[in-house]
From Swiss-Prot:
The keyword Membrane does not apply. It holds the Pfam family SH3_3. It comes from the Bacteria. Residues 42-105, 112-172 form the SH3b domain. The keyword Signal applies. This is Uncharacterized protein YfhK. Keywords: Signal. Residues 1-29 form the signal peptide. Disulfide bonds: none annotated.
Length: 172
């Protein structure tokens, strides 16, 4: 009898494990080369880490050039991918992790009629915004591993926060 109960428990556990493997994955960040968006050549971000390493390469193996401190503002020249941003540090091209960045607010307009999802794209209600609607960009969506998902812009529209497809925005 004990053997039968153990087998039932193992079978149930295996089934639950497979269910977890086949459940819907979190949204994956689109590679930057797949996104057509008019972004400013550089934009300001705030560091949200005690100390953030500044590296020579866009990976954890790059040599550390120094650090930037929490609440310090940095100009991002470009995003290498969802996880790394290129900046200038002491006159040199350098890289920081996007996992510890918060975008400063900036203005944008919708380029066409577009959906505004609140509270999230996955679980939100869509409201249609007409072309030329002004919004404040507060940040980006997040990738599965915590970097930026540039497919989505996190915006404020009339005091309500939600998400709009980045491709439908013209940044100023």
């Amino acid at each position: 009898m004990k053997k039968k109960q153990v087998m039932l428990a193992l079978t149930a556990a295996a089934g639950l494990g497979l269910t977890a493997l086949h459940s819907a994955p979190a949204a994956k960040a689109a590679p930057l080369h797949d996104i057509s968006v008019s972004m400013p050549s550089s934009d300001t971000y705030i560091i949200k880490a005690g100390k953030l390493n500044v590296r020579t390469e866009p990976n954890h193996e790059g040599d550390i050039l120094g650090t930037v401190s929490s609440e310090q503002k940095v100009k991002v020249d470009r995003f290498v991918n969802a996880d790394w941003a290129q900046i200038h540090f002491k006159g040199k091209k350098a890289y920081i992790s996007t996992h510890f960045l918060m975008k400063t607010a900036s203005q944008a307009k919708t380029t066409k009629q577009t959906a505004f999802y609140t509270p999230t794209p996955e679980n939100g209600k869509a409201k249609q915004l007409s072309s030329g609607t002004e919004v404040t960009i507060l940040g980006w969506g997040f990738s599965e591993n915590g970097g930026f998902d540039f497919t989505w812009a996190f915006v404020d529209y009339g005091g309500v926060k939600g998400y709009i497809h980045t491709k439908d925005l013209q940044m100023r």
